[in-house]
């Protein structure tokens, strides 16, 4: 990452003092603590409604239940920094709040190129006394087995683990990956076995590529597609997210039965790479995934409320601030900065004119609440200052002298 202009100990001390004050102001109106909540970040592999893709239409809607949930709670479009890949990058951004578009072009996968080599990796995990990761697949991909302990996770449930095995293993028809129902059953086990507050990072696998001859009955989602796109792949994919639709809805019913505050942040990491649209023409649409943030009945009794501002278009970096705001939880100075970024800046991502599948990064692209790309030059002076402060913080923690670790900025 390039050294931002003005980087120095004095500058970072100024940033720490300033966002301490921002945090104090925000926390005046907050009554809860994150560490008393159970927050689940659920990365849903390749989840995005095909009906948003130009030239694609399906005979039926594969995700009616999730669409209904989205109408009832905080929800919108997440701008992904990948197409057809880049899962670990979206996961990294949600957990740290840092942006891929701030890194050097050659740093395309922080999980393998950065995290293992840093002594300190501040994440949302450190706001909790207990944290668990669940991934119904191998721990080897993207060095998760190395990175999760560095992030502060106490346990990691994965396929092949003897200490923390994946149970309730089910597959659907000819899909070789474990189902989303499997993922949620293991998450429910964790919620029931650890009775206190906790953070859970759940990464599913069911809808991972390939999308050939996976399911029976795909005719119910018969697809009309553009030139070059294989309708059978779209139909198989649609059937997969139909099963996700059912599994998520059932999981929400189960967490509503638990008498403690639980908030689920559900998001698709990227679209499946099955659409042969022009990236130059349709790039933004090919980087739009679905997200929602659902707080169970117990959380609502404690003051959790649907967010109504800045929710239409967000980035993975926004979920820490959004989860804290929805649960009315107090924030650290760094989380206060993320809160300002969420409310005051457009969503930001790598260029949506490229695939962005763990290859090379690009300059930031900004997308406003109307879903339009806006230029950096259109930002106000205050917005540019906030963006520069953010770059300084990311540089200090990941490539600089770690001045902020000697302050309470990240605590």
What is the role of each PLM region?
Residues 24-30, 44, 49-411:
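Solvent-exposed soluble domains appended to multi-pass membrane proteins
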Residues 1-41:
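Membrane-interface segments at or immediately adjacent to transmembrane helices
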């Amino acid at each position: 990452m390039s050294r931002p202009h003005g980087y120095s100990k004095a500058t970072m001390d100024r940033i720490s003092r300033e966002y301490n004050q921002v945090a104090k102001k925000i926390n005046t109106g907050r009554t809860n603590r994150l560490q008393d909540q159970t927050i689940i970040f659920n990365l849903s592999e390749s989840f995005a409604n095909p009906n948003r893709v130009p030239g694609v239409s399906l005979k039926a809607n594969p995700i009616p239940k999730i669409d209904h949930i989205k109408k009832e709670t905080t929800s919108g479009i997440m701008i992904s920094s990948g197409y057809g890949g880049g899962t670990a990058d979206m996961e990294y951004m949600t957990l740290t709040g840092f942006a891929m578009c701030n890194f050097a072009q050659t740093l395309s996968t922080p999980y393998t190129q950065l995290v293992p080599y840093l002594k300190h990796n501040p994440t949302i995990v450190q706001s909790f006394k207990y944290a668990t990761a669940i991934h119904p697949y191998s721990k080897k991909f993207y060095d998760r087995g190395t990175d999760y302990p560095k992030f502060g996770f106490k346990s990691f449930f994965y396929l092949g683990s003897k200490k923390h095995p994946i149970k309730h293993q089910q597959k659907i028809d000819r899909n070789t990956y474990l189902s989303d129902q499997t993922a949620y059953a293991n998450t429910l086990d964790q919620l029931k076995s650890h009775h206190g507050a906790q953070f859970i990072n759940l990464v599913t696998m069911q809808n991972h590529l390939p999308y050939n001859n996976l399911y029976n009955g795909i005719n119910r989602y018969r697809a009309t597609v553009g030139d070059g796109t294989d309708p059978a792949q779209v139909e198989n994919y649609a059937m997969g997210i139909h099963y996700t639709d059912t599994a998520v809805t059932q999981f929400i019913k189960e967490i509503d039965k638990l008498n403690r505050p639980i908030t689920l942040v559900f998001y698709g990491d990227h679209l499946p790479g099955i659409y042969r649209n022009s990236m130059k023409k349709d790039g933004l649409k090919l980087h739009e995934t679905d997200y929602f943030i659902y707080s169970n009945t117990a959380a609502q009794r404690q003051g959790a409320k649907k967010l109504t501002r800045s929710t239409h278009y967000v980035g993975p970096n926004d979920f820490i601030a959004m989860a804290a705001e929805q649960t009315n939880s107090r924030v650290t100075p760094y989380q206060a900065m993320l809160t300002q970024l969420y409310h005051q800046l457009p969503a930001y991502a790598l260029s949506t004119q490229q695939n962005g599948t763990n290859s090379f990064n690009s300059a930031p692209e900004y997308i406003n609440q109307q879903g339009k790309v806006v230029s950096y030059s259109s930002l106000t002076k205050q917005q540019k200052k906030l963006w520069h402060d953010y770059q300084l913080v990311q540089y200090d923690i990941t490539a600089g002298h770690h001045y902020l670790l000697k302050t309470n900025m990240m605590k």
